[in-house]
Structures are given as structure tokens and as C-alpha cells.
Amino acid sequence: MSDLNYLYGAPLSKADFKTTAEDFMVDEDLGIEFTGSGEHVCLQVVKKGENTQYVAKLIAQRAGVSPRDVSYAGMKDRHGVCSQWFSVKVPIKKPIDFSDLNSESVFVVSQQRHERKLRTGCHKGNKFTITLRNVTDPLDILCRINAVRSGVPNYFGEQRFGRDGHNLVMAEKMFAGERIRDKKLRGIIISAARSHVFNQLVSLRVKEHGLAKTMHREVFMLSGSNAFFEDAISDENIARLASGDIMMSAPMVGKSEKGLTEQEKVWLGPYQSWCDGLGELGLKNERRMLRLIPQDFSVETIDESTLKLSFGLPKGCFATALLRELVDYTDASPRERKEKDSKDEDPIK
């Protein structure tokens, strides 16, 4: 993400991020009311220093099913203390106590019956609590807080692209004709390529227009929906933007240029080979909100070089997109585990 433009200029302060697991805490907001009956058991699990797939395998072993039969709303980072929900089909007549899985790194908080399994992306969002250590300029961070509260570019985080951008290297090879037989890996690479093009376009818009300034024509998304429409800027649309009824958006490139504004086509020019490669895959044109606005953002000063940040984000959004506008951070999580994570990376957050 170092090549992407900042909305508020490059931050002055440096800090360490994820020095300990407790420095990065995530609480998944599922937003689902369980039916209390049905063949699917939903489990709320807190994991520390483990990835989502590892916990899914534990649940599968306990239920006597394949890991493919365990579902979850989204992947969560290994390097932190993360609460998330899983589901697995368990016959009503054969109840299982999943608290047997409890250990130093995995704890089952809740177990609920539900009529349907959890699906990827079914959650509402995530609540983050992040501790920054060895902060060199706390005042600069505190001065940026109010600006960041109004929104930051909704960039995809670097974890989407694999270690050292390996997923993008693989994408270039795939577009050049190299076959990728592993279906899951192929999906990860396609997602990374699409996200890269999105980031580059948003970065150009930030540089030339910022996010507060609307263009003559915009493609708007309906809040809480993937539906979008192109329209000229009008008093009505400005009022709808202010109320949160609609949002400005940027393209997730698909099989045609339909839905792109003329300015977006210009910005995508340098990445035409990427757009062509994605288009040949037959992907449906989609949009993603342009501005990421944190919810319930608060900051606590622990000491002269330690700050604790708390905020909520919608599903699919990255805490690092917000963090980079506040501080020049260094990921202090263990290197050897980080290398393993790059192989396990999943497109959903």
C-alpha cells in the first residue's frame, strides 16, 4: 500500500502494530438472530494466534465431518485475538458439546442452533481494538483523528495481495496464459488482481480530486446494497449523499466497461492489460464504496508512547486502510508466522 496516495498527506508519526496478540483485537458483528432450532450449530469462537482455517479443522474433527462442511462469514487475522462465528451441520438427535475444543488459543464462547448455515460475507462488520506502541509523535496522530472520522480511501489492505505482493505476480502469470488448477488459489489471485486495479484507480482519484469533491457524473451505490446507478450531480443526489442514503463508489472491474464513467475509463488506461485479463474471466461488473467511514471511533492515551484505538468497520473493509492515514506503522508480528499466513490468505475479510 506504500505506493497509494494519502487523503490527508503522509503521517509524521511512526509506531509498532501487532507487537503482541492483544494489540490487535477483532470482534465480528454477525448481525443474525438465531432461530434456536435446526440442524446447523453456530459457534462463536475466540482465537489467539491461530488462523480461521485451523479452527475450522478443529470443529470439523469434533463433528466428524470434512473441513469443507464448516463455514464462516470471513477470515480473521492469525496475529491477534479475534472473535468470529462458524457453523457446522450437526443432527439434532446427535448433539455435540464443542467446549471440548477449549485451549490456550481457542475458546468456544457460545453455541447456538440455526436453520441455515453461515455463508461467506453474511456478517455486518467488525469491531477493532488496536494498540499502537513506540509512537514517535502522538500529537500528530491525535490531530488527524477528526479528519479520519470523516472517512478515508476504502483501499484493500496489503494482506489481500500476499507476502511481497506474490498474488499479483501470480495474476500476471495467469493473464499471460499460465493455468492455475487449484480453484481456491485461482479465486484468491483473481480477487487480488481486481483489488489492485480498484486501489490504483482510487489512488488516482484521491490525487486529482480527493474524496470530498464530487465529479460531474458519479456512479452511486445504494447504502446497504450492491445496487448502483450512474447519474449527474444534483441537489437531490447531494442531499442523499449527506443523509447516507447513497454513497460514491469505484469499480470492481468486470467483463465490460458498462457502468464506468468516462473519467474512470481514463484512470484505468494504464491498467488496461489487467482490465482485459479480468474481463476475459467473465466477471460481473461490481462497485465498492469509495470512502470508508469508521463507526464509534475513539482513542485512549495509555502512556506517552502508547495509544489504543477502537472503531467499527463494515464487512470487507480493512483496518489498515484507516491506520495508514494516521500513522506510519510497522507490522511487528512474528516474521516466520507472517510468511505462513501469506499462503493461507483468503479474499474475504
Swiss-Prot record:
Reactions catalysed: uridine(13) in tRNA = pseudouridine(13) in tRNA
SUPFAM superfamilies: Pseudouridine synthase
One GO cellular component, as annotated: cytosol
Keyword annotations from UniProtKB, A to Z: Isomerase, tRNA processing
Family statement drawn from the similarity comment of this UniProt entry: Belongs to the pseudouridine synthase TruD family.
EC number of the protein: 5.4.99.27
Enzyme class: isomerase
Keyword Isomerase: yes
Residues of the TRUD domain: 151-309
InterPro entries: PsdUridine_synth_cat_dom_sf, PsdUridine_synth_TruD, PsdUridine_synth_TruD_insert, TruD_catalytic, TruD_insert_sf, TruD_pseudoU_synthase
GO-annotated molecular function: RNA binding; tRNA pseudouridine(13) synthase activity
Function, as annotated: Responsible for synthesis of pseudouridine from uracil-13 in transfer RNAs.
GO biological process, any: tRNA pseudouridine synthesis
Superkingdom: Bacteria
Organism: Pseudoalteromonas translucida (strain TAC 125)
Protein name: tRNA pseudouridine synthase D
